Amino acid sequence: GIPVCHNICPCLIDKKTPPWTQVLSACLTSFEGKSLELPDETNFEISKPVDEKMFLELCGHLYLVDDEDRTEWLDNLAADLEVILDLYSLMTWDDIRSCIQNGFSIGSHSYTHRNLLQVKESEVLEIEISFSRQRILDETGIAPSVFAFPNGLYNDRSLKVVEKSGYSIALLCDDKPANIDIINNSDGLLMLPRINICRTNWREEVLRSSGLHYHLKRITNPR
């Protein structure tokens, strides 16, 4: 079967650095404007309170921006808003080992949580995928079998590195259920879809998790 799995980015633990999504969340808590100018010079409308659906939509926009540009933009935004991050709330390797002792499996979510579609250098791709697996093995004694693509973004090149690195399951964000044919197919496990739960409307989430929402979208928008 597919294990209950907590997917981590080892670099964030090694460097005690919060993920950029946590920095963004802290910034939005302090932000009082009605729109944000993003690094690509587009404007994103903000309404308070910022719910999870809006937050994920904003993350989706920012994830398509070059990693260095996004980091610089967030650093400037956090400085302008005088945001102070609670670094004590970040997980440590001791916490990860405790998770394993309590029945969790640990998977990789890449080394630094960058957009793998933007990675051109083979060495960087190896670090994000293969070295990430090695770091988890070094710290826990268990080589992870699961790789969760950051934001579900992947291509043939990154998928081949995942398979070569020894992972047997790769998680996407296609927002559709995985049927039994996929689960029973070893190749299908390397492109396993998932459904993101936003906790905004429980009725909609029931439809999405059942697969009905996905099939209705395919009927109304076959492209």
Language model: regions and residue ranges:
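Extended, charge-rich helix/loop segments that form flexible
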Residues: 16-102
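N-terminal-biased segments
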Residues: 51-53, 110-116
